[in-house]
From Swiss-Prot:
Entry-linked SUPFAM superfamilies: Ankyrin repeat, DHS-like NAD/FAD-binding domain
E.C. no: 2.3.1.286
Protein encoded by which gene: sir2B
Record has Lipid metabolism as a keyword: no
Protein name: NAD-dependent deacetylase sir2B
Catalytic activity: N(6)-acetyl-L-lysyl-[protein] + NAD(+) + H2O = 2''-O-acetyl-ADP-D-ribose + nicotinamide + L-lysyl-[protein]
Active site: 608
Keywords assigned by UniProt, alphabetized: ANK repeat, Metal-binding, NAD, Repeat, Transferase, Zinc
Keyword Chloroplast appears in the UniProt entry: no
Stretches forming ANK repeats: 83-112, 114-142, 148-178, 191-221, 225-255, 260-289, 317-354, 358-390, 394-423
Bias-annotated ranges (Low complexity): 733-746
Organism: Dictyostelium discoideum (Social amoeba)
Ligand binding (Zn(2+)): 616, 619, 642, 647
Length: 778
């Protein structure tokens, strides 16, 4: 759930970077409950049952008792608890400085992977312990990362411990080689946030300057959504950072585009951050003058044109910053939106009647927004020459927009403006919206019959389908050429249940799937604990193979043993084995069919876990089902129990249950892999389960994306896909009396989507056959 919330918040750039608990605080509150009743204050504090006396005394800063224990048992100093914490971690978390000093003197291990004691001190802002560890030269490697890929430097910056951040930087700069130091400076976390970006988000200009000037931080570093430090500064209205970053990064940084197709000034416009917009314009003027050696009014027009190329640029949706300023429906301060518009027009030279990709002006946008917010902006735009008679691509003016959105005050204001300006525009307020493509006349003709209009629309739709098909095949050939020539070196495949359907494992959500066949079942601890028989019966029915009579050489070797890998599985393996371009296969499947094709395990990440591993939820004993004991027990209708004599609880597969986070491998690898990806292939997944579904947007905006699936989904969907889906649904209901998600249509659809995507819609294996046939045809 946390990962889903983070992905939802990307657009607003509310970065959830603060650790969800301070490590020291967590121990106190987990192990020492609040005492609200007087009698409880006399009770001894509670600690984890696993904690030895050494851990307890270390936590409580009991120097003499700790010394006594480690003198008797020297090896106990490096013992760890279930969190992999040593007595040093525990002492640091509670700021037990005397015990920390003692343990450091006794050569306790300081480089335990993930959170080191140094990480904890940096996170908690404990300057004394940081200084003590530095003075004693007992500091771990600066590039040791936490579970979320955070360095100690990153954690100190995240929590605004500037003095500690300075000391950490200074220490490692003198003790590391330059390459290792640079690696630490630019190390991003699992969300792609670097120390520089975090310093911007924390509005710490001193740290920004120190990272860049002393650490040579990469000013072009970007988050998971491709937002740079300048994007972030624009969003939080950090004008001092904007000025400084632009001085260094220049126009190249200003033109950087994030996942949403926005430059930094687009983001400032969305927020109505007029101060940031003003700073952008002022700094850009200085940069343009400097770059073009302009020294007078003779170059003023050139300067303005160069400026407009940057501040009037359209985003992915065809909107300029001015349009975005006017889309103020969610604005908390409409005055800021008005000031932003004034800055863009009066100081940036943006045209008041400039149009977006839909031929709409800023006034069109305002006419759609509730008049309680947009009325002051409408008055301003009319006062400086905005034309309310310009028609958008549907033939509507701002007057039509206001009328049909029931913004009566704006509607009347626009009508009054027509009278005042003696406009000759002939207003037909009942005019219907009619899409006017670039190939048709912009003038509307009321004499056109409805039949001819319908015919034109139909032929236009057919033309679009044919164009999309031709463009899709052309793009597919380009992808194939790229694979043949070795141009694609880091291909990522996202695969789902659809690629295993032809192996006899139906996707969960179809009429033959696991969820439909057993309404009581869910992948949840609640079902496993309360109804283990229901849980394992569903697992047995869905995953355990129906083994037919076979010869002596065949053997039931566990899950899906009688099920063979599909053409889609072998296609993924070919990317690795034949073409050497597979970087990683991220799969939602918990079956081992991909491994059976010969794909190396290090090339596969099971995002939702795998049935290869099992464990006991009580004693935590791990099981690898090499001997097939677990599946044989499930296959005969029994329950798999823990083999520990004192435990004997029902064990569970190492798959992700509802509400559980995805694996550490998934979180760490995705951020690094998707930055390298040069081709993304999506196969057999509905892209509705997050955070897996969000991965499709994590490749760079110029990376081709190829979808093999029964139907278009996620960002690949267009309006024609919706029409096809509705038509197929009606057809299936007419034939069987019920709706189905199964693919009864043998026809493959190959089409282009957007400016980079290709879809091959239909059965995944047939899509692979088509790909391979085309591959071998030239």
């Amino acid at each position: 759930m946390i990962n889903i919330l983070k992905d939802i918040l990307y657009k607003s750039y509310s970065y959830l970077a603060f650790p969800f608990f301070y490590l020291g605080w967590a121990i106190k509150n987990s192990y020492q409950p609040n005492k609200t009743i007087k009698e409880e204050e006399s009770k001894p504090p509670k600690y984890p049952k696993e904690w030895s006396d050494l851990f307890i005394h270390s936590y409580n800063n009991e120097h003499e008792k700790v010394l006594e224990i480690i003198q008797k048992e020297p090896n106990s100093i490096n013992s760890v608890d279930s969190l992999n914490w040593t007595p040093l971690h525990v002492a640091v978390s509670n700021k037990s400085i005397e015990v920390v000093t003692l343990l450091l003197e006794r050569n306790i291990e300081i480089s335990i992977k993930r959170y080191t004691a140094f990480h904890i001190a940096a996170c908690n802002g404990d300057l004394n312990i940081i200084e003590k560890m530095i003075t004693m030269n007992r500091v771990p490697n600066g590039n040791i990362l936490s579970n979320d890929m955070e360095t100690s430097l990153f954690l100190s910056i995240t929590n605004n411990h500037f003095e500690i951040s300075e000391k950490i930087m200074d220490y490692y700069q003198s003790s590391m080689n330059s390459n290792e130091f640079k690696k630490m400076i630019d190390q991003f976390n699992v969300h792609g946030v670097s120390p520089l970006i975090m310093s911007v988000l924390r509005k710490n200009l001193k740290m920004i300057k120190k990272l860049i000037e002393e650490g040579d931080a990469d000013i072009n570093s970007f988050k998971k959504d491709n937002s740079t430090s300048l994007h972030c500064a624009a969003i939080i209205d950090f004008t001092e950072a904007i000025e400084y970053l632009l001085d260094i990064g220049g126009i190249e940084l200003m033109n950087s585009i994030n996942r949403y197709g926005n430059s930094p000034i687009h983001e400032a416009a969305i927020k109505g951050n007029f101060k940031s917009i003003q700073t952008f314009i002022n700094q850009l003027k200085k940069i343009i003058i400097k770059n073009n050696c302009s020294d007078g009014d003779s170059d003023k027009d050139k300067l303005n044109l160069l400026l407009l190329e940057i501040i009037d640029k359209k985003d992915k949706d065809g909107s300029t910053p001015l349009h975005l300023c006017c889309n103020c429906v969610n604005s908390d301060n409409i005055e800021n939106n008005l000031k932003s518009c004034k800055v863009l027009i009066e100081e940036g030279g943006v045209q008041v009647n400039g149009i977006d990709s839909g031929n709409a002006t800023a006034l069109h946008i305002l006419a759609c927004v509730g008049e309680d917010k947009s009325l002051p902006l409408v008055k301003y735009f009319l006062s400086i020459g905005s034309d309310p008679t310009i028609e958008n691509k549907y033939g509507w003016t701002p007057i039509h927009q206001a009328y049909n959105n029931k913004n009566i005050q704006i509607y009347q204001l626009l009508l009054d403006h027509l009278k005042l300006t003696n406009s000759t525009y002939k207003l037909d307020i009942e005019k219907k919206r009619v899409f006017q493509s670039s190939s048709t006349s912009t003038s509307s003709s009321s004499s056109s019959s409805s039949s001819s209009s319908s015919s034109s629309s139909s032929s236009s739709l057919l033309l679009n389908k044919e164009e999309l098909k031709l463009k899709g095949i052309e793009r597919l050939k380009n992808v194939i050429n790229g694979i043949k020539k070795g141009e694609f070196k880091n291909v990522i495949v996202l695969s789902g249940a659809g690629i295993s359907a032809n192996a006899g494992i139906p996707p969960y959500r179809t009429k033959d799937g696991l969820l439909a066949k057993n309404k009581q079942f869910s992948f949840s601890m609640e079902i496993l604990e309360k109804h283990p028989d229901v849980f394992y019966q569903a697992i047995r029915d869905h995953f355990y193979p129906i083994i037919k009579a076979s010869n002596d050489n065949d053997r039931d070797d566990g899950i899906s043993a009688g099920i063979k890998s599909t053409k889609s599985h072998y296609f993924i393996n070919d990317l690795n084995e034949k073409y050497g371009c597979l970087l990683r296969n991220y799969t939602q499947n918990v079956d081992p069919l991909q491994e059976r094709t010969g794909t190396p395990t290090d090339k596969i990440i099971h995002a939702h876990g795998s049935f290869d591993q099992w464990y006991c939820t009580v004693c935590q004993k791990q099981y690898t089902d090499k001997s097939d004991r677990i599946w044989r027990e499930i296959g005969r209708g029994g329950l798999p129990f823990c083999t520990e004599p004192e435990c004997r609880h029902v064990i569970r597969p190492n798959v992700v249950f509802f509400g559980e986070p995805l694996s550490q491998d998934f979180r760490v690898n995705t951020i690094t892999d998707f930055r390298k990806a040069d081709l993304l292939i999506v196969m057999g997944t509905s892209l509705i389960v997050y955070p897996f579904a969000s991965l499709v947007n994590d490749v760079a905006s110029d990376v081709p994306r190829l979808l093999f699936n029964f139907e278009s989904t996620g960002p690949f969907v267009n309006t024609m896909d919706l029409e096809r889906k509705e038509k197929l649904k009606q057809q299936q209901e007419n034939e069987s009396g019920e709706s189905s998600n199964d693919n009864d249509n043998n026809e493959l659809i190959v089409e282009a989507r957007g400016n980079r995507d290709i879809v091959i819609l239909g059965d995944c294996d047939k899509g692979v056959d088509y790909f391979n046939t085309l591959f071998n045809s030239f």
